[in-house]
Amino acid sequence: MYVLFEGVDGVGKSTQIEMIARAHEDSLVTKEPGGTKIGQKLREILLGGDFKLSARAEILLFLADRAEHYQKMIKPNSSRLILSDRGFVSGVAYALANDASLKIDDLLWLNSFALEGKFADKIVFFEASETLIKKRLSSRGLIDAIEARGLKYLLKVQECMKEVLKAHKFNVLYIDASEDIATINAKIENFIKF
């Protein structure tokens, strides 16, 4: 089962992925961007801030990573529980936040192409208030190029993520990121039962 953990930075995705992975020893933990060797290089380019890419070039690099990630990580491990920190929802949402002229349907088609039509089996979406995001990001210290765009930008991305999830009949568990870790974990465990 291919499960995406989606939400902006600082909402608790990584914490929950670690907990779920410990409870499911045969699970595969991966991430986008950066889940493959080429993905790690693309991640450096995309998040490092060394290059000023156009919005469309950025989308295409994320799609290249997504296609490679699907071929090397998701497809060959389809019989396992795959826990991915981000995926196509983030890709589409960040693209929409960067360029309002883009259409969700076009971006979903491009992602479907990259994923051979295989979107995630289940999606866990973490939503957080402005106050919570600000608090958690300020406690982390280092900021990547996307986080550096600001809190308002991350809130815009979060709204775009919700639009993406509503645009298609995805199997989604909505999580209030302000809930305690154990409560969130129990909800996710129940959601991903085989």
Curated annotation (Swiss-Prot):
> Which positions bind ATP?
G7, V8, D9, G10, V11, G12, K13, S14
Q: Which InterPro entries match?
A: P-loop_NTPase, Thymidylate_kin-like_dom, Thymidylate_kinase
Q: Which Gene3D superfamilies match?
A: P-loop containing nucleotide triphosphate hydrolases
Q: Name one GO biological process term.
A: dTDP biosynthetic process
Pfam (any one):
Thymidylate_kin
> Organism source for this protein?
Campylobacter curvus (strain 525.92)
Look up the domain of life of the source.
Answer: Bacteria
Q: What is this protein called?
A: Thymidylate kinase
Q: What class of enzyme is it?
A: transferase
**PANTHER family in the record:** THYMIDYLATE KINASE, UMP-CMP KINASE 2, MITOCHONDRIAL
Keywords (A to Z) from UniProt: ATP-binding, Kinase, Nucleotide biosynthesis, Nucleotide-binding, Transferase
What does the entry list under GO cellular component? Answer: cytosol
What GO molecular function annotations does the UniProt record carry, in alphabetical order?
ATP binding; dTMP kinase activity
Family of this protein: Belongs to the thymidylate kinase family.
The reaction(s) catalysed by this protein are: dTMP + ATP = dTDP + ADP
Q: What is its EC number?
A: 2.7.4.9
Role summary: Phosphorylation of dTMP to form dTDP in both de novo and salvage pathways of dTTP synthesis.
